[in-house]
Each structure stands twice: as C-alpha cells, then as structure tokens.
Amino acid sequence: MSKRFALLWCSEEERFDYREEMVNAFKTENSDWEVISAFTDLNKIIDNYDGFVISGSEYSVNADKEKFSGLFEFIRAVHKKEKPIVGICFGCQSLAVALGGEVGLNPSREFRFGTDELTFQNGLNKHVGTSEERVRLIESHGECVIRRPLGSTLLARSDSTAVEIFAVGPYAVGIQGHPEISKKTLEQDFLRVHLEDGNLQEDEVRRFHAELSGYQPPQAIRQLVKATLHKQINFQNLVGDV
C-alpha cells in the first residue's frame, strides 16, 4: 500500500526552486508526495499524511520565530503522535527548537558553505546499509543546533558542526546538511544566491569549488530519510549518547 508524505516548504525564495529535486531524492516506489507551504494552517493536514519532511529556508528559527510559531506547534503535534518527521537544515533547527533544544550562530561565526565530512555516531551506519563511518555532505548555514532536545541521540558530527544529525523519539530526525541537493544545483543556484546575498565572497569561490570536487550526494543519508519516513528504524531502540 502506498504511503503519503508531505514536504513542508519553508522558503519564499524566488530566485530558484528545488522542490522537485528534494522530493525525488526521498521518493520511493511505494510513496506519493505533495508539497505544502509551511506558512499555511498545518494542523488541518496532520492526519492526511504518513510522514513529513521540513525543508531548508532563507529564514532564521531565532530571528523569525514568530513567523514559524505554527510550524513549531505542528512539529510538537506530529512528534506526540509518533509520526515520522525529518528536518533538513532549517528544518533540522526547527525540529530542535520545537522539541526543547537550542539553535545559535555557527561556532566559527562564519557562514558555512561547502562540504563537510560527517562521522556517524552510535552505529548509525549499520542502520542505513553502509560499512563506511564517514560521508561528505553539503552544508549551507549560518546557524546550527548548539543544544539537542532532552533525550535525543547524536547520530553524526563534523569538525564544523557538533550536531550534524540527531534523533529524538522513535521517528524524528534532524539533518543539518543537504543530502537532497545535487552538485549542479549547488554550483548553479546556491552559489549564485549566496554571492548576491553576501554570505560568500568572490575570493572564497575557489575554496568552495575545491571542496565540491568529486562530490556525490551521500546515499546513506538519503536512505536514512527514507527509512525514517517508512518506520524502518525506531531510534528509541538505539543505545548511545543521549
């Protein structure tokens, strides 16, 4: 039986759109997807879907918290019902804040744009079908989770971000990086917008391209999203760093 999932789109950016790419990254043969604006009344849809993915955003969970108060309430309601929910980048931070964690500026106080090497924690690699303990993942953020929700489990970290992936409860996962984005989208769209917005300077572009050399979206992280949505992993069964 096919399952229904919703991508909660948290962006109002008009210079590019990667909704279709994001859905395709996480879609399986037995799933149907719809894209829903995170700025609508989300409480009306909570029982219409089997799980949810929260997208990235140009907004801040701290500076724009009033704008997303409805999203935070929705996250708590979904979590209480133990429905699967995955947050990507801004979505990861929203998940953390809504469930009692804290988000702050990157430790470096600089915008992080490039790829980082993530190290899996608490045996996550075994649950996503890989023997590799490290993967490269695209990062594009000025803020990050600095305190996980109480009772959560750390699933991955990197040198730049202590909390790259975490889980709380049985089926809620936050991923700070962007497993959905292709190298092409990053180079053609994200790079252009970050240069226009001043998040990246021209003299940093060479470093960015060097980091991106040979990059492929990590299938292990995409599999983590799919397994979470389809309840193939119960994170409460993981024993580790809480």
UniProtKB/Swiss-Prot annotation:
Entries under CDD domains matching the protein: GATase1_1 (cd01741)
Entries under InterPro entries matching the protein: ChyE-like, Class_I_gatase-like, GATASE
GO molecular function: hydrolase activity
Disruption-associated phenotype: Deletion of atdA2 from atdA1 to atdA5 causes the accumulation of a considerable amount of gamma-GA from aniline in recombinant Pseudomonas cells and inhibits the growth of a recombinant Acinetobacter strain on aniline.
Active site, UniProt feature: C89 (nucleophile), H178, E180
Superkingdom, natural source: Bacteria
Glutamine amidotransferase type-1 domain ranges (all copies): 4-200
Residue pairs linked by disulfide bridges in the UniProt entry: none
EC number annotated for this UniProt entry: 3.5.1.123
Reaction it catalyzes: N(5)-phenyl-L-glutamine + H2O = aniline + L-glutamate + H(+)
Keyword entries, A-Z: Glutamine amidotransferase, Hydrolase, Plasmid
Annotated Pfam families: GATase (PF00117)
Entry GO CC: cytosol
Role description: Hydrolase that catalyzes the hydrolysis of gamma-glutamylanilide (gamma-GA) into aniline. May prevent the accumulation of gamma-GA, which is harmful to cells, during oxidation of aniline to catechol.
Name under which the protein is recorded: Gamma-glutamylanilide hydrolase
Protein's organism: Acinetobacter sp
Recorded name of the encoding gene: atdA2
